[in-house]
Each structure stands twice: as structure tokens, then as C-alpha cells.
Amino acid sequence: EKAVQNYFRPFDKHEAFIMDERSFEKGRRPMVTSIFLSKGCVAKCTFCQRGAKGYSVYDLSKLETYIKDLKDNYNVGFLVVADENFGSNKKYTYQAVELMHKYDMLWAATGIRVSSVTKEDLLFYKNNGCTSLKFGIESGSQTMLDVMEKKFQVEDIKKALFACHDIGLNSPPLGFMLGMPGESLKTAKESGKLMGEIAAHLKIPTGLIFKHNDLLYTIPLIGTPVYEYGKQLGLIGQSTDEEEKFLEITSNVGAFKRYYINFNGAPMSEVVFWDMLVFLEATRSYEKLMKNKTENKELKQKYINQNNVQALNPHVKAKQNKIRKIEVMGAVTEINVPISQYFVTNFVKEN
């Protein structure tokens, strides 16, 4: 029984729910757990390692039994829908959403395409218990979206996010990715511009722009087109042993700059500057658009509360062993020792 409780935690320790006032209503069951409504994804993004082929949905009758059990026996009142691709099957999604609402669940979805929703969908979701939707956008550059084969436009991103914000649905920190083949100073600036536009639309207070965005560097995952591209360039190993070593090293690292493999072709002095350029351009774009607007002080307090919650979550700040600092083109970066040795040996070759 004690082990089972590890799968649940109080809602006020989860950032997906504390931004919504409905979470604090009297009588609501306090525990949160994750569920799946579907498996797989309809997209074929070139950087994404697919956990399952195809796309399938969970049986609705079994889903209802499961939700009822969670409520009655585990005091659950909040659900995190952990699908890769929430909402692609519209008819099924509406039925599943109605089921969650039937059992008085507040819920959030952590993986949704901007092309999978309309404003009418968002209103339906909110009215049936949705508190938060996390979109996978990856870039503000149409060039890079096309390289990633995201199959949507930058305007689709704005349309979905602005609709969420306008009807009061929270959208957690957006994920931006740098370093795919074709990335450049120009495309990095385009991502920064979009980041600033979104922040200005929300009237996010100065200093919180970057807390609303995750900015990561591409890691080539085995089985993806970008991994095969890296192999063709000779960056992932010339032999089976070298490839095995690469996989061993990268199997448990995050998508951060310190682990980036430069299959882009840009000079490393430019590569290490991309993330800073994104933030600089985001600030410039934000300040320009906010000239005649007032910061949203209520939203500021909500983000402060959210940050306090994230600080309590042991998964947010994963500890790394054997950290040291090395200098890469003038940028001091904290790097795991085996990764740093591999990085310096194989990729920092620029004169």
C-alpha cells in the first residue's frame, strides 16, 4: 500500500493545477495522478523517438472504471493526461473529457499539437475541467519547423496559445529547441521573436519571460532521422564500439547545451550563443510590444506560487554526479565528466 502511494501527490505540489482557482474549491479530492488516454502520435517529427508505432486510444468503458477507482479508493481529484498526442482523435477526446468531468476531475494534458485544437475545443475542455495544456512547439522559425516536419505554421502556434490565454486556460512553459540541421543566428532570432510576442500577449511581468519558456538543445535519439543524419556525418561513431559508447553516454542526459553535438555545421562560437540570442531577441520583442501595456500583476503572483511549487518537486532539479567546469569557446559550462571528455575530444575542433 505504501508503494502504491508513490504514484500520487497533493495537487498543491503540482504546477499544472495551482494556476486555476477551481483547484482550491472546497470538497475537491486532493490527490493527483497520471493517466493515458492514447498511445502513440500522428506526427513524425524528425527529432522524436517514437515509443509506439501508430496511434491508438484507450477503451472508454475501462477508462471509466479506472477513473472511478482512482476517485473512490485513492482520493484522486486531479488527473495529468500524459499522452504524447492528446486530442488527435476529436470524437474520442470529447468522450474521454466528458468522462473525467463526470467524476469531477480537474485535468491537464502534457502533450498536444497546436494543429489539434480550435478555440471551440479549448472552451469545451475548460468547461469540462481542463486547467492546463502544454503544447509542443519547438521553434518560432518556419524554416526549423519544416526541418522538424512539425506540419504546422508559426501562425498556428500563435492562434492556439493566444486562444488559451484569452479564455483563461494556463499553458505551462513552452519548449523551444535549438540546434537542428539548418539552425542559424536568423532562425534563433525568429524563435526569440515569437517568445517575446507570446510573453507580451500574456502581459507577463518583466523577469518572468524566461521562466515561461524551456530552451533546449537537440539530442539525437536513436531511431530518429536526425540520429541517422548524425551517423552519416560521422559524429556518432565510425564503428559499432564508438556508437555504443555514444549511446551509453547520452542515455541518461538532458537536452542541454553542454551535451550538444554539432551536426549543424555552424561554428561552435555561434552555437553556444544561440540560446543567449533567443533570450536577447525575446526581450527586445517583448519590450517593444509592451510599451503601451501594463504588466499582469495577478499573473506574476501565480508564477511566483508556481515557482515555489516547482522548488518542492524533487524531479525538477535532478542532481548530477561528478560535475566540473570546462571552457568551450569562451563560455564556461557545467558538464558531466564523461560527456565533457567526449565533447572536447570529438566536437570542439574549431580553431
Locate each region found by the language model.
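Flexible glycine/acidic-rich beta-alpha junction loops that bind and position SAM and/or redox cofactors
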Residues: A43, K91, T143, V147-M148, ...
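Structural recognition of alpha->loop->beta junctions
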Residues: N127-S132, L194-L215
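Helix N-terminus capping/helix-initiation residues
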Residues: E1, R113, P267-S269
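Glycine-rich beta-alpha loop elements in corrinoid/cobalamin-binding modules
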Residues: E1-F8, I219, G223
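Short alpha-helix in the alpha/beta-hydrolase fold that links the catalytic acid
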Residues: A188-S191
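Radical SAM enzyme core and accessory elements
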Residues: D20-E21, G27, P225-N351
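Radical SAM [4Fe-4S] cluster-binding motif and immediate context
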Residues: R9-G182, K193
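Short, well-ordered loop/turn and helix-capping segments at boundaries between secondary-structure elements
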Residues: V76, K102, K150, L194-H201, ...
